[in-house]
A protein has these predicted regions:
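ATP-dependent small-molecule kinase catalytic core of the GHMP/sugar-kinase superfamily
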Residues: 95, 105-174
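A glycine-rich beta-to-alpha transition motif near the start of alpha/beta enzyme domains, typified by
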Residues: 2-120, 159
Length: 174
């Protein structure tokens, strides 16, 4: 059986340091079932190809709201590269003329500072908040840390192919 799925919507594909998403301006477009849409558009063989789908929406608590869906359709809380592209999108497409904006995400409201040159955003700085270092909140297998009585895996010694390394497990919210 051949699966047929037709979707007509305007979108923009953007990337921040290679982390690419399909962006939809939900001030103009409606996206029903964003989890399924994310899976379809993210497919690099039969879709547009991306790390996921980001919806740019109106917000009652901030200047904008960002809803992010991963390529597997799961909803993410936050993506630093993705939110920087949201800032560029809303400024460059005329949704705001502010050079500091607030964007509501599933991990809270983020404040972004936009550096503008010749009417276009050249750089975006975002306060991502405090990093998560507790292994069970990242998540990461915590057996070794628990056995050693550690609450965090910071500068933890490991061996990879016989070579010694130190690792720190950290999450910024997705």
């Amino acid at each position: 059986m051949i699966e047929r799925y037709f979707l007509v919507m305007k979108f923009t594909k953007m990337h921040g340091i290679g982390n690419d998403y399909v962006y939809v301006n939900c001030f103009k477009e409606q996206v029903t079932n964003p989890s399924e849409v994310a899976k379809k558009v993210s497919d690099r063989h039969f879709g547009i190809g991306s790390d996921g789908l980001i919806l740019i929406k109106p917000s009652d608590v901030a200047d904008f709201e960002m809803d992010m869906y991963n390529a597997d359709g799961s909803q993410g809380a936050m993506c630093g590269n993705g939110i920087r592209c949201v800032a560029k999108y809303v400024y460059d497409y005329g949704l705001t003329d502010k050079t500091q904006i607030r964007v509501a995400t599933k991990s809270g409201i983020k404040v972004l500072d936009l550096k503008v040159k010749d009417g276009k955003v050249q750089e975006v700085c975002v306060d991502m908040g405090a990093p998560i270092l507790k292994p069970d909140e990242i998540p990461v297998d915590v057996q070794a840390a628990e056995a050693a009585g550690e609450e965090r895996l910071v500068n933890w010694p490991i061996q990879v192919n016989g070579a010694p390394y130190h690792m720190t497990c950290v999450s910024m919210g997705n």
